[in-house]
A protein has these predicted regions:
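Thiol/selenol-based redox catalytic cores and closely related redox-interacting motifs
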Residues: 99-100, 104-137
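Amphipathic alpha-helical repeat scaffolds
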Residues: 29, 49-53
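N-terminal "domain-start" segment that seeds a small globular fold
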Residues: 17-38, 58, 122, 130
Length: 137
């Protein structure tokens, strides 16, 4: 599995410079499967940094409610990251169990990534390089 993640990361790094759309990225899900964001063309996407030991952990319940109500047209993707105060120390399996057991999460979750720093995930590096980073439209 680590080998797959490593190869996937290298591929994303090498192709990142040529990407013009978020739909050109793939993510690795919390289950270790590759999910192409191109599958969500025509839908709105909401990317949410998540952490199981954060003061905002209850956001999972609200996100799940939104997913249940609008999931046909809106794709929610949770991106667990341990970049802020060590609030997501668990493994992918730990995170998945926590989210399912405590909040009934059924929206898409990525594997645990880094969203800042030297080891930033390629998708978030690309997002940060885009104009209109405030996402105000």
């Amino acid at each position: 599995m680590r080998y797959l993640v490593f190869i996937f990361s290298i591929f994303n790094f090498l192709t990142m410079a040529s990407q013009n759309s978020v739909h050109e990225f793939d993510i690795i899900t919390i289950d270790g499967k590759i999910q192409s964001l191109s599958a969500f063309k025509g839908k709105k996407m909401l990317f949410v940094n998540t952490a199981s030991q954060c003061g905002f952990t209850s956001q999972y319940k609200a996100l799940q409610n939104i997913h249940s109500k609008y999931g046909k047209d809106l794709v929610i993707i949770g991106f667990p990251a341990n970049n802020f105060g060590g609030q997501e120390p668990g493994s992918n399996s730990d995170i998945k169990t926590f989210c399912s057991k405590n909040y009934g999460v059924s929206f898409l979750m990525s594997n645990k990534i880094s969203i800042k720093g030297k080891d930033i995930d390629p998708l978030f590096k690309w997002l940060n390089s885009q104009k209109n980073q405030s996402f105000n439209g």
